[in-house]
Swiss-Prot record:
Organism: Rattus norvegicus
Gene name in the database record: Man2c1
A GO cellular-component term linked to this record: cytosol
EC annotation from Swiss-Prot or TrEMBL: 3.2.1.24
Family of the protein in this entry: Belongs to the glycosyl hydrolase 38 family.
UniProt keyword terms in alphabetical order: Cobalt, Cytoplasm, Glycosidase, Hydrolase, Metal-binding
Ligand binding (Co(2+)): H259, D261, D371, H576
GO terms (BP aspect): mannose metabolic process; oligosaccharide catabolic process
Gene Ontology molecular function, alphabetical: alpha-mannosidase activity; carbohydrate binding; metal ion binding
Protein name: Alpha-mannosidase 2C1
Amino acid sequence: MAAAPFLKHWRTTFERVEKFVSPIYFTDCNLRGRLFGDSCPVTLSSFLTPERLPYEKAVQQNFSPAQVGDSFGPTWWTCWFRVELVIPEVWVGKEVHLCWESDGESLVWRDGEPVQGLTKEGEKTSYVLSERLHAADPRSLTLYVEVACNGLLGAGKGSMIAAPDPEKMFQLSQAKLAVFHRDVHNLLVDLELLLGVAKGLGEDNQRSFQALYTANQMVNICDPAQPETYPAAEALASKFFGQRGGESQHTIHATGHCHIDTAWLWPFKETVRKCARSWSTAVKLMERNTEFTFACSQAQQLEWVKNQYPGLYAQLQEFACRGQFVPVGGTWVEMDGNLPSGEAMVRQFLQGQNFFLQEFGKMCSEFWLPDTFGYSAQLPQIMQGCGIKRFLTQKLSWNLVNSFPHHTFFWEGLDGSQVLVHFPPGDSYGMQGSVEEVLKTVTNNRDKGRTNHSGFLFGFGDGGGGPTQTMLDRLKRLGNTDGQPRVQLSSPGQLFTALERDSGQLCTWVGELFLELHNGTYTTHAQLKKGNRECEQILHDVELLSSLALARSAQFLYPAVQLQRLWRLLLLNQFHDVVTGSCIQLVAEDAMNYYEDIRSHGNTLLSAAAAALCAGEPGPKGLRHYQHTALEAHRSVGTTQGLVGLTRLALVTVPSIGYAPAPTPTSLQPLLPQQPVFVMQETDGSVTLDNGIIRVRLDPTGCLTSLVLVASGREAIAEGALGNQFVLFDDVPLYWDAWDVMDYHLETRKPVRGQAGTLAVGAEGGLRGSAWFLLQISPNSRLSQEVVLDVGCPYVRFHTEVHWHETHKFLKVEFPARVRSPQATYEIQFGHLQEADPQQHSWDWARYEVWAHRWIDLSECDFGLALLNNCKYGTSVRGNVLSLSLLRAPKAPDVTADMGRHEFTYALMPHKGSFQEAGVIQAAYNLNFPLLALPAPGPAPDTTWSAFSVSSPAVVLETIKQAEKSHQHRTLVLRLYEAHGSHVDCWLHTSLPVQEATLCDLLEQRDPTGHLSLQDNRLKLTFSPFQVRSLLLVLQPPAN
């Protein structure tokens, strides 16, 4: 052994070892340069296609000679390479690799099956042809390499999140056969880890110096040109790593993981190939490392692979049986945690868990959502209702203002449901097994002393890639060595089981898990948000009418297969980079096409159900109006009269979950006792609308100067202020353009001033009064709006059309209220949250832009003002000002985001008493669910009919559908929730022929103790605050 000098300098010793393993410096004489030995060329041919062809079709194409250095492209095309190789006889007994480096993402095909992904960005640049070449092995072989013209994270022009460069070209830089020296690889791993220990523990730690001196001795012993020196060097490393830690060492549970965004900086179709590249690589690793477990979420991606790569899918199922491939999450996709409705969140689990049960024999026990932009306070209840009590995520480590205080804790939801939550303390779902990451997992843990276990997700992610053999080798060496936490390769189930054993001292977080970042995603790509809201409602209506038709018609077949397809499209669009608008233009276009598919087929199914529902009943031909919520509706609706299709208004009353005939010219109801709408335009150009419930005054530019609750004379608009005030903000974030709106945007507020004289009267009163105006927002953008007040309606509507052509601007509308309150209320899934004024401490201040669904409310003791909407999500309440976020104009990753024409409606509702007493929730449902007017193909009923009603206004009947596993196809599922935040006993009335009623969970599994007795066509139900309850109703066969 070479003698070490008496004194050693820490830095020079450290850097000496660094250079010995460097892939950049001194590779002509260092160890890294010996990783590969002898090599030989391969014969290449290729063909280029704009399509993503299946293997069977691709290999039939005409291939032309190709060589290293060739360029191909452009972006989103595919280049297929035929690789013909001959392995030299002298390589028998050696490990042989195909070395491949190219721009883009590659997939190796062997014998017609995908076998491994190759991507420079994912540190996968060689494919193992043989771990030890045998004399009997074939020497000649033909492989195919499918190269996608996009990188692991898309093809952004100039930066990762920039819009894709459509002209980008790609190049093949290496293709050869080479002998791989596994002993060199092992030494490189040892030395890298020793350097990591030395650096991570620092110069004041004895074990740090021990690691550094061990590495130095290895360099002294190891001559890269003489492999016979390697074993002695490796023995020094083994001795170091063989020194065990104490019993109190923290245990890290390392799980292989490959986060693949279902669409983001690449289109949906490319994700299918990303799955094949990533998961075929994981299969090879599972074959070579029997202790390695790989967690995989998102049923949609598995279904894609099942359909397009059946051989690979069969391997995944086999490794699932062995316990190495572990399905997690339980959802169809890793959805956004804010914007989807409560019912849509339930369907994520319903579709996902049923898929995992059918395909892998069991449901998931962990909810897995590592990357999303916030977490609704109703998720714990939804998880528990779907058989899940464990939750893993890490996105809150991105918080901009406040550091979240826990990594392992209980999360208590809106109704009191609790789940065990773990954030891997390394603050990443894409670890690589370095010492730095392992140490951070311990030092960064905010629950030290409460639990001695942590998760560690390793593998390249976001764009796929997944784990590598090098990552596994690192983690194995760190299994139990002094100075480091214990590392064991575990499954998510093993991690949570260990955490549950230590859960007695864990803290509890109550309410929403709010991400203090990415709050621009509540508004970006407004058309995607609108499509989401509309399609959620269309599917609600199709299920409702189909269920009622099923109950009343023996001939009607519930469209279960069609509805599953449409629901899965909607759930796909609710992926956390799609509905949020943080995706490229190609993805947004695909999503809009999916919405159109849902609309088109949904409306066809609606018409079929309506026709079946009333078939055979006596009455005149014409229209029927359907009420699709459990509330009686009194609405002014348009009725088409005459051959020319002229529209006139009529007042219609439709019962809860039922229908009524449309009025004819001879059956129009008198207005009394309701007061007709009064409209007056003053000489100064202002307009007053009054329906006896509220009185609205607009100034000549269309701003709201007064909103009075007539019965009390109470003014809702702050003195001297203007409501319906459009405001424009500069909107330039720090980096994440489509994602972020920063706090400083509030400092750039600019009111958009209209011109006096643009306000004109529209509808002149009676059943409806309105006024409209035009507003030039900027030289490039304009707005038109009709302000509408209907007879008997407690709110005024603002029908808005915007032509928007801006760059980094943010449009909002504001309503200063004559209300003083320290907190506002925001609707969320199956309930609401109350949040403090964001001008208080940092946890509130970070909520300067928040999300809500259909309404927000600001109330004091006996009066309040609610702001409703039909397709918006971003909002805020600062002081007494209610604000609705309308449109943004980011330029990355989609330069076209939000550009063009938009239509939307919001409404303002002053009210006496609390929002619960005033019926704000019902009003928001009415705004979002206008009466369905469907033609009667034959005789239509001339009487009203109601299928269900609920005795308490606090309980909302949200969903009526056929049960997923209805053996006789005669079982309905009803989902109800308590919306006021109160304990409620109520009656559910039904006119349907119910034979049996039972409580069930959200997966529609019967509660064995949940039998409900039917009394006079009524069921008694009990709710705690914000509780969601589901019922199974078995129907008697209809008479016809």
